[in-house]
UniProtKB/Swiss-Prot annotation:
Belongs to the complex I subunit 5 family. Its EC number is 7.1.1.-. The lineage of its organism: Eukaryota, Viridiplantae, Streptophyta, Embryophyta, Tracheophyta. The gene is ndhF. The chain crosses the membrane at residues 9-29, 40-60, 89-109, 121-140, 147-167, 185-205, 224-244, 258-278, 280-300, 327-347, 354-374, 396-416, 425-445, 551-571, 605-625, 726-746. GO terms for biological process: ATP synthesis coupled electron transport; electron transport coupled proton transport. It is a multi-pass membrane protein. One of its GO terms (molecular function) is quinone binding. Pfam families: Proton_antipo_C (PF01010), Proton_antipo_M (PF00361), Proton_antipo_N (PF00662). NDH shuttles electrons from NAD(P)H:plastoquinone, via FMN and iron-sulfur (Fe-S) centers, to quinones in the photosynthetic chain and possibly in a chloroplast respiratory chain. The immediate electron acceptor for the enzyme in this species is believed to be plastoquinone. Couples the redox reaction to proton translocation, and thus conserves the redox energy in a proton gradient. It catalyses: a plastoquinone + NADH + (n+1) H(+)(in) = a plastoquinol + NAD(+) + n H(+)(out); a plastoquinone + NADPH + (n+1) H(+)(in) = a plastoquinol + NADP(+) + n H(+)(out). This is NAD(P)H-quinone oxidoreductase subunit 5, chloroplastic. One of its GO terms (cellular component) is chloroplast thylakoid membrane.
């Protein structure tokens, strides 16, 4: 077994030859490299598959042996400072390695077809392989210095991937926003690492945890300083995992290609922050204030992400806010001390979210043939609908991912989310109420996405020619570059109400407003969504199912979504041990909680599951009631009429919905607040500094120079241009200076 561990250092470096060879090929033989560009997908998938097999072997050994292996090389040692580099193989490393490689392989296979017509195909695979290298290096790091190095590389890769279509201003701004926001977290992480080294004198995890715990136990360190250092470390995780208040970069990160979104949101960047907290969990557990802070940030992010996803019309942004909320559940579990539940939800969410993102990519890919290569149109759920007829396989995969995220058994996320909800009741009833309510919101907005996308009719074919309004959209060519084309829009698309409201009244996208059955039934024939005429003349009339190379990863991820949850079934009765995850995590769990038991009996599990599933079904029911296609809603006429005839209460209800809609659609006004305070303040400070530098600093320097120039000119004219005159003036000034110095010396 140890023989296998000795070669684990190669794990991060196996995918590295791909970006290196692509770079060398583009420098030396660019034409041949570009002509044979499709072949680079094979080595990318092959090398990552080797890493996956290696990681699986290590995981099997972890299950059988329950051991932790660490190997280090001394780089520089003296009496005052030592730095060692190495790798650490423990359950957390093996779990993350399998997660990164399996999702990464699916994304690479999917991307071969998705990016086949893009001019940046080679650049895309180089970035993706280097991103996998960076993340694998991060999870195998044995000390904080290595963590920070690979942490920065992961951030750099995310910057490159988000801004992949850098010719589009909105994509360039998005990658800059992600980079700057993560700079805040990275600066906090660096300060926290330096603070911990100042306290313990070590960067190695084992030594650091042991020394730190002894110092805390013996009360030999300032508690305020320790809390500050731990908080700074947590700031890095907050930024990387898009937790409140550093979450603002996440929805803008959707400007990259969809496979990148799947990788970032499932296995790489956002998982890095969760991994950091899990890796430093023995340190955080001895500081109660930090654990409370982690759980507080987690529960705020859970609720905020869910509310912001309610009214999004971009399918990828909706999934982005869903990621934010679900990672909030994971962070909440870590803050509550539920180490196993947190990692369990990280695993189940990663596969479900990868399935949803790749499914959304298949949807976008099919919609591009109808509306053109513009994200504003191909990702807009208002233009979708009825895709079940055109993409049945994608629909089935997306539905399973949706139900999993909603928490419907026996799909993956049900098991992990149910465990977190149960633990939250033991930790704080207030947190539990928020977490359970958000579970219902999750089911609501996820099923809303599904209904708007797949049910009903293809809404892009409903065109409304009333009104005149022009708008300019950035259109994406098949090469990923911006086309400066102005598209005339007769009327900007929106969800129209089904009531007898005047045309001047504000339509709400958040809800299909009431059915005027008691008035004019014929108004039910009006389309649910009014669509503008985008001017796309030469496009296919209908979407189509994706190719097999894009559907294969979806089917594999469907299998993961169906069965990966069974590794964490918390049953251990009558000798039947089904909890593989606890056995896998045994070394870490025993280190943190020696006497912890995760098993529950059937009665307790069923009682808790009925409650959580009921909440999920209630959210699905509300979404079905509000967003189900018009023609299938006639059976609910009596219920709808009840809401329509509410009278004055209906006005209050509409006002409440508009408030919720405005909050959600405007991102909770958080971006607006940051723009008005931090961004404007920093720009004002920069302008003030620029003014001070130009007018004051440069003014003093230039003033001295100008004064010297005029003094010199004056002396030149006094001397008359003769050397004897200059010499006489020089000696005169020297004599005057000596006399002044002499009299001053006498006075002293």
């Amino acid at each position: 077994m140890e023989h296998t561990y000795q070669y684990a250092w190669i794990i991060p470096f196996l995918p590295l030859p791909v970006p290196m060879l692509i770079g060398v090929g583009l420098l030396l033989v660019p034409r041949a490299t570009k002509n044979l560009r499709r072949m680079w997908a094979f080595p990318s998938v092959l090398l990552l598959s080797i890493v996956m097999i290696f990681s699986a072997d290590l995981s099997i050994q972890q299950l059988n042996g329950s051991s932790i292996y660490q190997y280090v090389w001394s780089w520089t040692i003296n009496n005052d400072f030592s730095l060692e580099f190495g790798y650490l193989i423990d359950p957390l490393t093996s779990i993350m390695s399998i997660l990164i490689t399996t999702v990464g392989i699916m994304v690479l296979v999917y991307s071969d077809n998705y990016m086949s017509h893009d001019q940046g195909y080679l650049r895309f695979f180089a970035y993706m392989s280097f991103s996998n290298t960076s993340m694998l290096g991060l999870v195998t790091s044995s000390n904080l210095i290595q963590i920070y190095i690979f942490w920065e590389l992961v951030g750099m890769c995310s910057y490159l991937l988000i801004g992949f279509w850098f010719t589009r201003p909105i994509a360039a701004n998005a990658c800059q926003k992600a980079f700057v926001t993560n700079r805040v977290g990275d600066f906090g992480l660096l300060l926290g690492i330096l603070g911990l080294y100042w306290i313990t004198g070590s960067f190695e995890f084992r030594d650091l945890f042991e020394i730190f715990n002894n110092l805390i136990y013996n009360n030999r360190v300032n508690s305020l300083f320790v809390t500050l250092c731990a908080s700074l470390l947590f700031v890095g995780a907050v930024a990387k995992s898009a937790q409140f208040p550093l979450h603002i970069w996440l929805p803008d990160a959707m400007e990259g290609p969809t496979p990148i979104s799947a990788l970032i949101h499932a296995a790489t960047m956002v998982a890095a922050g969760i991994f950091l907290v899990a890796r430093l969990f023995p340190l955080f557990t001895v500081i109660p204030y930090i654990m409370n802070l982690i759980s507080l940030i987690g529960i705020i992010t859970v609720l905020l992400g869910a509310t912001l996803a309610l009214a999004q019309k971009d399918i990828k942004r909706s999934l982005a806010y869903s990621t934010m909320s679900q990672l909030g559940y994971t962070m909440l579990a870590l803050g509550m001390g539920s180490y196993r539940a947190a990692l369990f939800h990280l695993i189940t969410h990663a596969y479900s979210k990868a399935l949803l993102f790749l499914g959304s990519g298949s949807i976008i890919h099919s919609m591009e043939t109808v509306v053109g290569y513009s994200p504003e149109k191909s990702q807009n759920m208002a233009l979708m609908g009825g895709l079940t007829k055109y993409a049945p396989i994608t629909k089935t995969a997306f539905l399973l991912g949706t139900l999993s995220l909603c928490g419907i058994p026996p799909l993956a996320c049900f098991w992990s989310k149910d465990e977190i909800l149960n633990d939250s009741w033991l930790y704080s009833p207030i947190f539990a109420i928020i977490a359970c309510s958000t579970a219902g919101l999750t089911a609501f907005y996820m099923f809303r996405m599904y209904l708007l996308t797949f049910e009903g009719h293809l809404n892009v074919h409903f065109q409304n020619y009333s009104g005149k309004k022009n708008s300019s959209f950035y259109s994406i060519s098949i090469w990923g570059k911006k086309e400066t084309k102005t598209i005339n829009i007769r009327k900007y698309f929106c969800l129209s109400t089904l009531s007898t409201m005047n045309d001047n009244e504000k339509d709400s996208y958040f809800l299909k407003k009431g059915y005027p059955i008691h008035g004019n039934v014929r108004s039910m024939a009006r389309p649910l969504i009014t669509i503008s005429h985008f001017g796309n003349k030469e496009t296919f009339p209908y979407p189509h199912e994706s190719d097999n190379t894009m559907l294969l990863p979806l089917l594999v991820l469907v299998l993961f979504t169906l069965f990966v949850g069974f590794i964490g079934i918390p049953f251990d009765q009558e000798g039947m041990d089904l909890d593989i995850l606890s056995k896998w995590l045994a070394p870490s769990i025993n280190l943190l909680h020696p006497n912890l038991s995760n098993s529950v009996d059937w009665y307790e599990f069923i009682t808790n599951a009925i409650f959580s599933v009921s909440i999920a079904y209630f959210g699905i029911f509300i979404a079905s009631l509000l967003y189900r296609p018009v023609y299938s809603s006639f059976q609910n006429l009596e219920l709808i009429n009840f809401f329509v005839k509410m009278g004055p209460n209906r006005i209050l209800w509409d006002q409440l919905l508009n408030i919720i809609y405005n909050w959600s659609y405007n991102r909770g006004y958080i971006d607006f607040f940051y723009a008005k305070t931090f961004i404007r303040g920093i720009r004002g400070l920069a302008e003030l500094t620029h003014f001070f530098d130009r007018r004051v600093i440069d003014g003093i320097t230039n003033g001295v120079g100008v004064t010297s120039f005029f003094v010199g000119e004056g002396i030149k004219y006094v001397g008359g241009g003769r050397i004897s005159s200059y010499l006489f003036l020089y000696l005169s000034y020297v004599l005057i200076f000596l006399l002044i110095s002499y009299f001053l010396f006498l006075n002293l």
